Amino acid sequence: MANKFETIEAANRTEFGKGSARRARVAGLVPAVVYGADMESNLHITLNHRDFAGLVRRNGVNAVMELDVEGVKQLAMIKHIDQNVLTFNIDHVDLLAITRGEKVEVEIPVIVEGQPAPNTMFVQDADTIRVEADALNIPEEIVVSIEGMELGSQITAGDIKLDDDMTLVDDAELLIANVVLPAVEEAPAEDEEGESEGESEA
């Protein structure tokens, strides 16, 4: 659980537009915006790209951090990361300002582990589930096991055991994973084989 959070330094942005954002990225910075219900206006900042990317690697895409914006502290969590589709560099970040004890809705990755019954396989239908959780207590992932499950068995969102301080937001019937028969590769039709043999003899 994310009971602890890291501090990351930020600076106020004074320039806006595509040109200024491009210059910031060239300088190793990530443009970001911080918003929240209790904020009078959005806060536009820049983050150190290396520091922020490291925070995401260590804490996941729902990471909570303490922003130090030129000496002013603010708790925030990641809401959206805009990545370049070619370089995968982080182009822009949306951050939600939060307070201790606040509940937030987040999508948490679901990891399926284990092996179903022999001669079956599992299909994962949903990679995430949406829950409401304490902003400072969000798990990086939720693990479900399909170990030994028989053909036709299913796991729905409602089957997943959540911590006491978490509430499922998704439909309880949302299908997460199910056990099916492996796909069978069809053999070539006999007449096609015969035609091939006849052609080769000719």
From Swiss-Prot:
GO cellular component terms attached to this protein's record: cytosolic large ribosomal subunit
GO biological-process terms attached to the record: translation
Molecular functions (GO terms): 5S rRNA binding; structural constituent of ribosome
SUPFAM superfamilies on file: Ribosomal protein L25-like (SSF50715)
Keyword vocabulary terms for this entry: Ribonucleoprotein, Ribosomal protein, RNA-binding, rRNA-binding
CDD domains from the UniProt entry: Ribosomal_L25_TL5_CTC
InterPro entries xrefs: Rbsml_bL25/Gln-tRNA_synth_N (IPR020056), Ribosomal_bL25/Gln-tRNA_synth (IPR011035), Ribosomal_bL25_b-dom (IPR020057), Ribosomal_bL25_C (IPR037121), Ribosomal_bL25_long (IPR001021), Ribosomal_L25_dom (IPR029751), Ribosomal_uL5_bac-type (IPR020930)
Family (UniProt): Belongs to the bacterial ribosomal protein bL25 family. CTC subfamily.
Role noted for this protein: This is one of the proteins that binds to the 5S RNA in the ribosome where it forms part of the central protuberance.
PANTHER family the record matches: RIBOSOMAL PROTEIN L25/GLN-TRNA SYNTHETASE, ANTI-CODON-BINDING DOMAIN-CONTAINING PROTEIN, RIBOSOMAL PROTEIN L25_GLN-TRNA SYNTHETASE, ANTI-CODON-BINDING DOMAIN-CONTAINING PROTEIN
Complex and partners: Part of the 50S ribosomal subunit; part of the 5S rRNA/L5/L18/L25 subcomplex. Contacts the 5S rRNA. Binds to the 5S rRNA independently of L5 and L18.
Name the UniProt record assigns to this protein: Large ribosomal subunit protein bL25
Organism the protein comes from: Corynebacterium efficiens (strain DSM 44549 / YS-314 / AJ 12310 / JCM 11189 / NBRC 100395)
Lineage of producing organism: Bacteria, Bacillati, Actinomycetota, Actinomycetes, Mycobacteriales
